[in-house]
Swiss-Prot record:
This is Serine--tRNA ligase, chloroplastic/mitochondrial. Belongs to the class-II aminoacyl-tRNA synthetase family. ATP binds at R336, T337, E338, V352, E423, I424, S425, S426. GO terms for biological process: chloroplast organization; mitochondrion organization; plant ovule development; seryl-tRNA aminoacylation.
Length: 514
């Protein structure tokens, strides 16, 4: 059985350096099984003008044009272009507030071109049908010959315009998919510093002795081995040892047990998914600063969060209203390139390439998504309060929202070793942004039958569901919090009481004596 060579696509800084490399690189780095490569950005498709009408206009100058042709999209989002056109000002402000690079003018111009071209196609189809009808009657030979020639010309023109229409629709999708979700009206406008505190729980622990960070604690207690992992896998990988392994399992099992009590169905997920699923969930699997590892030579990626495979479970489906809400708590390993991450604030377990996480995911009716968002946040806050953490919940500002999020709350916990708060979870309401891309709809309960005949035509129209996601437990950062906050003067670490039954009754991680 041959060994497949994986080349993991991830944008890296040009100034990247590592002890593994002796000279600068350009496009591709090969690390035995793994490598990272830079993807060229797709150039906009040149829309071919048609001579039968002036419906197709030039794309705005902000759209770069060259001789390259954008690849046809492998999937299409059900974007409401008419709504975008009718609410241009609101969409424009939203794009600006979120610091998005979406090109609204290009989208609107392409949409207008498409509408005009569709009208022209429909006009030619009607003319061709009229010619066909005339051909059925009794005609003089000369008239029949003229109609045959006219029908032939119309067919050729129609084929050309239909090809143009397909290309125009593809380019419209290509450009429009960069438009972010709209934003909740209560979200603060600005950068991360503009985020509003929803609440703050507890207070920083006061230590009467010099404190250690989790790296030193992990070394002294023989819990974490970064050096061996760096030799085996590279930087930002780690081994957990001894009680740290039990602590990870305890965190996950306790979290799952608590969240399941709220009616969430437990899942484990695939950790390799198709790139299209990553894109449909609102992540960029390739390009500058991607956080996604792509498997070269395939259409697959390693997941950065269980949100992605869980979102794909009901892809291209119509759910019954009675089946909603669907609430999941999913365990997975997560893989992130952490491109651009550096500095003391990201050292140790705080920012790593591979980690375990439990993720909550909700599929619901649109009118229920805000209440489920509050439920997710409350579950997170209850979990962290039970573990005795000092944390604050932030309503994140517009510029800190990812493309799918309508609103996002982050929770930051106090990390004594860092001397600051660090993010440990987030909860996002993505409304119908993901469902329009994943094709997840539901059919409202059928109203009383009033017509004489019951049939498909009488069924209520389907609607797009809303999706939400929230972190229940990101293991490495939770371990940072617990090790640093529960350290004792003698070098030991106390295990929070809720976790002890899941660690065989262990109450204390003690220094190892050689």
């Amino acid at each position: 059985m041959g060994l497949h060579k994986l080349r993991l696509a991830a944008a890296v800084p040009v100034t990247f350096s590592s002890r593994l490399f002796l000279k600068p690189f350009t496009n591709t780095l090969t690390l035995g099984l793994f490598s990272r490569h830079l993807q060229p950005r797709n150039k906009p498709l040149l829309v071919r003008a048609f001579s039968a009408s002036a419906a197709v206009q030039d794309i705005p100058a902000t759209q770069t044009s060259d001789s390259s042709v954008a690849a046809r999209p492998l999937w299409k989002a059900a974007i409401d272009f008419k709504w975008i056109r009718d609410n241009k000002e609101a969409v424009e402000i939203n794009i600006r507030n979120r610091n998005s690079n979406a090109n609204l003018e290009a989208v609107l111009q392409l949409y207008e071109n498409m509408v005009n071209l569709q009208k022209e196609v429909e006009r030619l189809r009607e003319e061709r049908n009229n010619v066909a009808k005339k051909m059925k009657g009794k005609l003089e030979p000369s008239e029949r010959e003229r109609l045959v020639e006219e029908g032939k010309n119309l067919k050729e023109s129609l084929v050309t315009l239909e090809e143009d229409l397909v290309k125009l629709k593809d380019e419209l999708q290509h450009v429009a998919q960069s438009i972010p979700n709209m934003t909740h009206p209560d979200v603060p406008v600005g950068g991360e510093d503009s985020s509003a505190i929803r609440q703050e729980v507890g207070s920083p622990r006061e230590f009467s002795f010099p404190i250690k960070d989790h790296l030193q604690l992990g070394k002294d207690l023989d819990l974490i081995d970064f050096d061996s992992a760096a030799e085996v896998s590279g930087s930002k990988f780690f081994y957990l040892k001894n009680e740290a392994v039990l602590l990870e399992m305890a965190l996950l099992n306790w979290t799952l047990s608590q969240v399941m009590k709220k009616g969430y169905t437990p899942l484990t997920t695939p950790e390799i998914v198709r790139s299209s699923i990553v894109e449909k969930c609102g992540f960029q699997p390739r390009g500058d600063n991607t956080q996604v590892y792509s498997i070269d030579g395939t259409d697959q990626c390693l997941i950065g969060t269980a949100e992605i495979p869980v979102g794909g479970i009901h892809m291209d489906s119509i759910l019954l209203e009675s089946a909603l809400p669907l609430k999941y708590i999913a365990f997975s390993h997560c893989f992130r390139t952490e491109a651009g991450a550096a500095g003391a604030a990201t050292k140790g377990l705080y920012r790593v390439h591979q980690f375990s996480k439990a993720e909550m995911f909700v599929i619901c009716q649109p009118e229920d998504s805000e209440s489920f968002h509050q439920e997710l946040i409350q579950i997170e806050e209850d979990l962290f309060t039970s573990l005795g953490l000092h944390f604050k919940t932030l309503d994140m500002a517009t510029a800190d929202l990812g493309a799918p999020a309508y609103r996002k709350f982050d929770i930051e916990a106090w990390m004594p070793g860092l001397g600051r708060f660090g993010e440990i979870s987030s909860a996002s309401n993505c409304t119908d942004y993901q469902s329009r891309r994943l094709g997840i709809r539901y059919r409202p309960s059928e109203p009383p039958q009033t017509g004489p005949k019951k049939g498909k035509a009488n069924l209520p129209a389907t609607k797009f569901v809303h999706t939400l996601n929230a972190t229940a437990c990101a293991v490495p950062r939770m371990m940072v919090c617990l090790l640093e906050n529960y350290q004792q003067e003698d070098g030991s670490v106390v295990i929070p009481e809720p976790l002890r039954p899941f660690m065989g009754g262990i109450e204390l991680i003690k220094p190892k004596h050689k």
